[in-house]
Amino acid sequence: MKLVVSTTLPLKDYRGIEFSKDKKDVQIFRQVHGIISDSWLVDRSNKVNLPFASVALPEYSLNFPIKNIDLDTACFNRSKELIASNKKIYVLWSGGIDSTLTVVALLEADIPKDQIYVVCNTDSLKENYNFFLKISDRVNFVSTERVMQILKYDNLDGMVLSAEHGDLSYGYDFSSEMLQILGPDYLKLPATRENIVKYFTHKKLDVESANCWYDVFMESAKNSPRPIDTTYDFSWWAGFNWRWQYALEKFRMRFYRIPDSTTFFIGQDIQNWSIHHQQPDLNNLRDFKPEYKKIIFRYTGDEDYYKNKIKHESTTLYYGSNSYAAVLENQSRIHTKDFDLFSYYQEDNFINQWICR
């Protein structure tokens, strides 16, 4: 049985240190969490095996028809697809750019008021109070705390819709750090070993591990639906491929029953927009996601938000302590007290092959 998603905590404490003493591949694997934090990496292109046996679920497959589509059309099509489910839609709204775009797209597609429930808390209102006022007569509001309590023990009477994948569709994770650490010109450089290793070593990977992870990502990029030419493209692929499954499964893992849940940006048309969108001119954090903010501005007329809004972490919306440590491919969940990550170790993996090359 393979892992769908797992906590990374055992890799970071004494257990990871002890297990990796005689395993160079695990030592290299552990280092990547200095750049991707707690994300459980799964190659949805099915090109590369890492040291712990994981499976890419069909839900996240890259095997869909590739076409060029504009973001407006993609958002409209995704909204109509969700509305056609005839389910109540509980939108997790943090007040941030991605979740605000999700709400705007649904409203522009004329979602009935009795179908849309905006899940928010005081942090959501602090981040985007004007939008809260703007939509107050078109949606139903429900508190984050109430929804999370229900999901701990039961399912909602509808679908949970998050804006996870919004960052990954845009290549935000690595590129925002690259911009701040190495400057805007770096994002236009070729995705060569020298350039990517420079970023990795700035993030405290040793030189050998940095070179190995460059090869891990570039080997999987052979299956990318988009050329990986620049460091920005590299950032896009790291999220769009490697963190895609984790983005939704980290939410599902939290609850006793797997909720009826999806993300707005997982729609195939939006993924196609992501594949084809051109690198924007990025000079500071305000320059990220102009296409998202343009759609929001069209609905709200909030010029300050359009020009100056930057991403903030939105984890207070629905993340916290979690009693589950992993989800297996049969969808069973394992409690933290019962979980042994190292029992999923597989010696036949790309990093070992790289070491022995």
Q: Residue locations for each model-derived region?
A:
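Nucleotide-activated chemistry modules centered on ATP-dependent adenylation/adenylyltransferase
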Residues: K2-N68, D72-K88, A105, Y117-R357
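Conserved G/P- and acidic residue-centered "switch" motifs that form tight phosphate/ATP-binding loops
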Residues: G96
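Short, electropositive, low-hydrophobicity segments enriched in small/polar residues
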Residues: S99-T100, D167
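Active-site signature of alpha/beta-hydrolase-fold catalytic machinery across serine-
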Residues: L101-E108
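Phosphate-handling active-site elements
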Residues: D110-I116
